């Protein structure tokens, strides 16, 4: 899947789950399961409930995503 195929959305982290998974509520109101991207994991970026994040969604599965950015 190329970079052009992903859907980027903004959301808020609701809760932290095991294995670096997070429950994220998108601006549209949908709740998805998201994991941290490799760059955030490598640089030890902490993500806590209440943080605003940017999530990439695959057009094939809109219930799972990848957190690519944490807003300051």
Swiss-Prot record:
RNA-binding listed as a keyword: yes
Primary site of residence: cytoplasm
UniProt entry keywords in alphabetical sequence: Cytoplasm, Initiation factor, Protein biosynthesis, RNA-binding, rRNA-binding
A cellular component annotation (GO) from this entry: cytosol
GO molecular function: ribosome binding; rRNA binding; translation initiation factor activity
Pfam family, any one: eIF-1a
Subcellular location: Cytoplasm
Segments forming domain S1-like: 1-72
SMART domains from the UniProt entry: S1
Subunit structure: Component of the 30S ribosomal translation pre-initiation complex which assembles on the 30S ribosome in the order IF-2 and IF-3, IF-1 and N-formylmethionyl-tRNA(fMet); mRNA recruitment can occur at any time during PIC assembly.
Record's function text: One of the essential components for the initiation of protein synthesis. Stabilizes the binding of IF-2 and IF-3 on the 30S subunit to which N-formylmethionyl-tRNA(fMet) subsequently binds. Helps modulate mRNA selection, yielding the 30S pre-initiation complex (PIC). Upon addition of the 50S ribosomal subunit IF-1, IF-2 and IF-3 are released leaving the mature 70S translation initiation complex.
Family: Belongs to the IF-1 family.
The protein's name: Translation initiation factor IF-1
Species, as recorded: Clostridium beijerinckii (strain ATCC 51743 / NCIMB 8052)
């Amino acid at each position: 899947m190329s970079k052009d195929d992903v859907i980027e959305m903004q959301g808020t982290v609701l809760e932290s789950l095991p294995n670096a998974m997070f429950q994220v509520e998108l601006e549209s109101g949908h709740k998805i399961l998201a994991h941290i991207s490799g760059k955030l994991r490598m640089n030890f970026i902490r993500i806590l409930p209440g943080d605003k994040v940017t999530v990439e969604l695959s057009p094939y599965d809109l219930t799972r995503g990848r957190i690519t950015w944490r807003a300051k």
